[in-house]
């Protein structure tokens, strides 16, 4: 009880104590507690905020992870789809492979069936052949495993049979040999012919304006005649014709021949004596056949040569000289004759001990000589016909031009001196018929111009042909006669080719200096065909020909080139289109005068003679070759000089166009380059024709030196010719 009272007393005292007013110390403690509570609340709020931030970050991460997972799932699905597609493709490939294998199997089956059919056919042919063979002939088995053993056994048995038969001295030996007999054919009942149309007679060859058509009409007439004759021959031959039949008969032979026959049949090797006997037995037949084949080949080869020459002449007369020049190359003719000689050499090696060889050799040589002579005569006749027609045509054209000039002389005096173009509104502008003084001189009959006096050439350098921007290269070439000069050079080249071939065949081929002559001819050819110029070309800068007309045209060329160098810079004062048009006209005019000079040189070269100091020298052949090469160098220098002059004028025009800088400058420069290239090609293409022309100059000198002394004609110096 006392304890409970004490507790109650303590509780009351504590309550009383709590109800008492606070002291200062108590107040301070309260303040500290309040501050601590506030700080704790702030820290709690901060921690809450941090927790919320962390939670937000975690949520963002979770969102990103979920997005990535979705993307990964999509990629996995895509990969699965790709794998499915690959599996499908593999299945398709398997199906295709299976189909291919099935096709291969079917093809193999078909091939096997074809092979079986072929084997059956072979068996049938073998059985048919065995009917004609010897009764004792061995049938080769077709079983794959036992073929070799069966063949060996059967060969042994056959050997024994042959030995037994040979041992009997009184036995006669027979072999079966195939023989061809002839019998008359049975007459065939010809059906009654339906009323045929009357045969059209073969057209007679008619000379047309084109020589190629004339040759083709001859070919048609010949072919129609041949077909008609062939038909008549076939109709006649059907009545009493014979057919050949192969039969077998028994022939008695000697013991050696019988043994050799069976050894050949069994495929056994023959002895050396039997080989030599066999060669001697068959040698006569082989030799005769070889001779006949050689003669036949020679005849056909010659016929081909003549046919080629006729075709070649037809193309020559229809298409011009250039095609003929390519086809009439000496190397082509040499190739044909070389083939015939090879055939004769092979025949000679085979049948050198035969008497028939001498006869065949004479026949072949006579045949070749006559065929080549015929070829040359055909070519020369065709050439002479064509050249005379061309001369007549050119003379008629000159007469017509002279008449037109005389008729137009009076109205031209009333007009201005500057030439004009045709100004018809419906037709394109073309050059007038009036030409400059530069093209009045041509190369016809240049051999007769040695005594002509030199003329003073006057050039109207301000002459115009085309209007600005209307330059036409083809019309300009015709205006300045460029095509005519080129045709003259090509014509001389073809004529020189034919003459060179004739001299080579008749004179050079039988002489002892053939090898040295061939060296000079090859050197001339390489000189013109080589793109690089020789080092000593500058030493040939002066012309030394016997034709005085060459030096007149050379003077004319130099005067025009000097005036053109003064005239070209003045084109800068005109419009760029007009200046280019005038410049191109002058380039083509310079080209025409250069071609006139080259053509005149070409026409005088075949008649050029070596000076006396060359022909009278002991070492005549070498000196003549050096003289011919020096002349060729002079021509090559002239061609090179004209080419460089054209390039110089073109370069001056290029500088004028570049200095003006117009929108059309690039186009105009391109046109200038194209036309300059065309003009240069006209000059450079003449080098190919000069190969044959210079070769015939050299061959003429060699021919005269071999046949006998000729009257020496010294080459005049240039100073003497000018005086």
From Swiss-Prot:
GO annotation, biological process: positive regulation of transcription by RNA polymerase II
Amino acid composition bias (Low complexity), ranges on this chain: 30-42, 397-455
Entry coiled-coil feature ranges: 53-173
Biased composition (Basic residues): 1-12, 181-190
Any one GO molecular function term: transcription coactivator activity
Extent of Basic and acidic residues compositional bias: 45-129, 149-166
UniProt keyword list: Coiled coil
Superkingdom of origin: Eukaryota
Name the record gives this protein: Uncharacterized protein DDB_G0279979
Biological source species: Dictyostelium discoideum
């Amino acid at each position: 009880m006392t304890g409970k009272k004490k507790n109650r007393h303590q509780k009351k005292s504590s309550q009383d104590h709590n109800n008492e007013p606070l002291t200062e110390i108590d107040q301070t403690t309260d303040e500290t507690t309040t501050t601590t509570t506030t700080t704790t609340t702030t820290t709690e709020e901060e921690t809450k905020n941090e927790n919320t931030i962390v939670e937000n970050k975690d949520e963002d991460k979770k969102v990103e992870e979920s997005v990535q997972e979705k993307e990964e799932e999509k990629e996995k699905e895509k990969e699965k789809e790709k794998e499915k597609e690959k599996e499908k493709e593999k299945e398709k490939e398997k199906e295709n492979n299976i189909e291919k294998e099935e096709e291969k199997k079917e093809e193999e089956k078909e091939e096997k069936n074809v092979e079986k059919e072929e084997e059956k056919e072979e068996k049938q042919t073998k059985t048919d052949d065995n009917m004609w063979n010897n009764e004792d002939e061995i049938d080769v088995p077709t079983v794959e495993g036992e073929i070799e053993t069966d063949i060996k056994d059967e060969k042994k048995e056959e050997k024994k049979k042959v030995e037994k038969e040979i041992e009997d001295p009184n036995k006669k030996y027979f072999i079966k040999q195939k023989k061809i007999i002839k019998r008359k054919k049975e007459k065939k009942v010809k059906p009654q012919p339906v009323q045929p149309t009357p045969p059209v007679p073969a057209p007679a060859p008619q000379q047309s304006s084109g020589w190629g058509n004339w040759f083709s009409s001859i070919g048609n007439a010949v072919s129609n005649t041949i077909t008609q004759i062939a038909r008549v021959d076939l109709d006649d031959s059907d009545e009493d014709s014979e057919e050949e039949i192969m039969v077998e008969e028994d022939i008695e032979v000697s013991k050696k021949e019988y043994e050799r026959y069976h050894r050949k049949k069994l495929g056994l090797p023959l002895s050396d004596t039997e080989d030599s006997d066999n060669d001697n037995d068959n040698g006569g037949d082989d030799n005769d056949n070889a001779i006949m084949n050689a003669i036949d080949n020679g005849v056909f080869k010659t016929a081909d040569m003549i046919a080629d020459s006729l075709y070649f002449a037809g193309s020559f007369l229809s298409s011009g000289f250039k095609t003929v020049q390519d086809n009439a190359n000496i190397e082509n003719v040499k190739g044909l004759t070389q083939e015939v000689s090879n055939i004769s050499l092979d025949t000679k090696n085979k049948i050198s001990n035969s008497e028939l060889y001498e006869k065949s050799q004479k026949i072949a040589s006579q045949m070749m000589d006559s065929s080549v002579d015929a070829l040359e005569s055909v070519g020369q006749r065709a050439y002479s016909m064509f050249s005379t027609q061309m001369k007549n045509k050119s003379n008629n054209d000159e007469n017509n031009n002279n008449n037109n000039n005389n008729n137009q002389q009076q109205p031209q005096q009333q007009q201005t001196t500057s030439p004009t173009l045709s100004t018809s509104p419906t037709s394109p502008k073309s050059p007038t018929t009036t030409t400059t003084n530069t093209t009045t001189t041509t190369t016809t009959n240049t051999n007769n111009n040695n005594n002509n006096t030199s003329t003073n050439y006057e050039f109207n350098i301000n002459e115009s042909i085309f209007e600005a921007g209307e330059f036409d290269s083809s019309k300009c070439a015709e205006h300045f006669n460029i095509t005519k000069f080129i045709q003259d050079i090509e014509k001389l080249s073809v004529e020189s080719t034919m003459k060179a071939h004739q001299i080579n065949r008749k004179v050079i081929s039988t002489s002892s200096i053939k090898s040295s002559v061939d060296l000079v001819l090859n050197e001339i050819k390489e000189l013109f065909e080589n793109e690089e110029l020789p080092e000593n070309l500058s030493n040939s800068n002066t012309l030394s020909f016997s034709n005085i007309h060459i030096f007149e045209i050379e003077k004319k060329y130099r005067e025009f080139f000097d005036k053109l160098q003064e005239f070209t810079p003045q084109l800068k004062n005109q419009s760029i289109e007009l200046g280019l048009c005038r410049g191109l006209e002058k380039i083509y005019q310079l080209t025409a005068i250069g071609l006139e000079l080259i053509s005149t040189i070409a026409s005088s070269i075949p008649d050029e003679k070596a000076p006396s100091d060359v022909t009278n020298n002991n070492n005549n052949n070498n000196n003549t070759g050096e003289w011919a090469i020096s002349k060729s160098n002079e021509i090559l220098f002239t061609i090179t000089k004209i080419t460089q002059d054209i390039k110089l004028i073109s370069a001056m025009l290029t500088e004028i166009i570049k200095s003006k800088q117009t929108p059309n400058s690039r186009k105009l420069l391109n046109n200038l380059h194209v036309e300059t290239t065309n003009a240069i090609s006209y000059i450079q293409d003449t080098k190919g024709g000069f190969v044959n022309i210079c070769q015939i100059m050299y061959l003429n000198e060699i021919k005269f030196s071999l046949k006998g002394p000729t009257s020496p004609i010294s080459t005049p110096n240039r100073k003497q010719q000018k005086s």
